[in-house]
Amino acid sequence: MKNNKGFSLVELIVVIAIMAILAAVAIPTFAGFITKANKASDAQFYADLEYAIQMANAGTGKEVSGLTVTTDGKGVITKVEYKLDTTTVTIAVSNDAATVTAPADNAANKETVNAAKDVIAAMDWSYDFKSAAWADGNGND
């Protein structure tokens, strides 16, 4: 008589069924962990963004509030808005341009940077509290 050293078909089906049950339980659990991690990451990003905005406007004596972040369907940020007292500051971003509209007495206080047209190594923005004007570090107001 031949000595068989293997699993029967029934044993293999039982093992596959057990693995399928474990996978059916484990996959939603892991998906839940990923969702929680993404939400925590988003919350930390927004907190960091709000802190950076508050620090950038700390010397103005104006209250920063109402942070709103708009994203496209893929989660890419397209617009950031916040209130500086009653004035709205808007940072709009597209594929090849970023437009910052800063608080001022008129709507002309706006700077657009177009990556397709402008050669940009670095741009440092500063705010002169005496003249109440923004400058881009290149002598442009």
What are these regions (language model features)?
Residues Y51-D141:
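Periplasmic/extracellular, small/polar-rich flexible segments of pilin-like filament-forming proteins
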Residues N3-A31:
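N-terminal single-pass transmembrane signal-anchor helix
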